[in-house]
């Protein structure tokens, strides 16, 4: 009687196939320009950048979801993402 939400729900996580090719070559070039790269990039850089970006974003999303679950919410807020990014450094 009146126990409310006792624990975080075990959620089914969807398995996502390898689709990081969605990060296009021009998008990586724009990120590099914003980061201060002036010259053109080597062909090998793009796959490595996709892999690094994937690992970084997975970590940020994992932290943001952890903040959301700790607050016993089901919606990830912008602040959850901000705190997750701050935690990354």
Swiss-Prot record:
UniProt main location, coarse: nucleus
Xref: InterPro entries: CENP-T/H4_C (IPR035425), Histone-fold (IPR009072), Histone_H4 (IPR001951)
Gene3D superfamilies associated with the record: Histone, subunit A
Protein family membership: Belongs to the histone H4 family.
UniProt protein name: Histone H4
PANTHER family: HISTONE H4
Species this protein is from: Blepharisma japonicum
Domain of life: Eukaryota
Coiled-coil features, chain-numbered ranges: none
